[in-house]
Design a protein with these regions (language model features):
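Deubiquitinase catalytic domains
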Residues: 148-244
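A general marker of short, structured functional hotspots
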Residues: 1-3, 13-16, 22, 37, ...
Length: 244
């Protein structure tokens, strides 16, 4: 059975390979030109500082980095958009399509009273310390249902943070890794999510840009991959995170 999926009118996956339309025929996208062609879909090469770091960890040096980022949107739902895009790659053959609202609702539906008490308590401590970055007051949230309503509101009301990251990882059975990319503070490091790698889970990698925006990380290997299993995580990322 032929696997065929179109990203755009000019870009498709066929039998595990990404192809682009050149005149009237399709040609395979290669490691030297992937970033030029997939820019039509929104992919671009990962920040130069991360290219340098990952190249240092590579067993085989490549003239063109295979690592890219996808800017999924900047409407306050960027974290949830990134997760949805990665899941859509996983569910492509099942014709299941997620959006940011689905991810918000997924967390809301699985949130327990105990988790709510822990989360809202922590937010109130942050508020007291003038370190709460959201535009709403956690002291105005009086119940789990109040918090769920806030959580499921699209846009800048609730961006998502590392506190809910563990909840989402357990729901999806997926590791979520975050790379800092801050041009202002010159911080290009691993963001510590305080979670250990689970080899039985799949994995998603994100870039956290300038402390305000998430982008999805992908790797080109015959096709762009942004949803990884233990075997498909690139060597450089496994080395960076010390994954055996």
């Amino acid at each position: 059975m032929t696997e065929e999926y179109y990203y755009t009118d000019n870009i498709r996956i066929k039998n595990g390979f990404m192809e682009y339309k050149s005149k009237e025929t399709f040609k395979r996208i290669k490691s030297h030109n992937w970033h030029h062609i997939l820019s039509e879909y929104g992919w671009e090469k990962i920040h130069l500082r991360w290219i340098i770091q990952l190249n240092r960890l590579s067993e085989s040096k490549s003239k063109n980095s295979r690592y890219g980022t996808l800017d999924c949107d900047s409407d306050g739902d960027c974290f949830f958009h990134c997760i949805a895009n990665a899941l859509n790659e996983k569910e492509r053959e099942n014709d299941i399509i997620y959006n940011s609202d689905d991810i918000r609702n997924m967390i809301s539906e699985n949130l327990t009273e105990e988790q709510y008490d822990m989360i809202i308590g922590y937010y109130r401590i942050m508020k007291d310390a003038d370190d709460f970055g959201e535009d709403w007051d956690p002291y105005q949230i009086n119940s789990l249902e109040d918090f769920k309503q806030k959580l499921t509101t699209s846009g800048h009301e609730y961006w998502g943070d590392y506190i809910l990251l563990q909840v989402l990882m357990n729901i999806l059975k997926c590791n979520i890794f975050i790379l800092n990319c801050n041009n202002y503070t010159n911080d290009f490091s691993i963001y510590n999510t305080l979670n250990d790698y689970n080899s039985n889970y799949d994995s998603i990698f994100l870039i956290y840009e300038n402390n305000c925006h998430f982008k999805l990380v992908g790797y080109f290997d015959d096709k762009i991959i942004s949803y990884f299993n233990d075997k498909t995580i690139p060597y450089e990322l496994k080395t960076l995170y010390r994954i055996n």
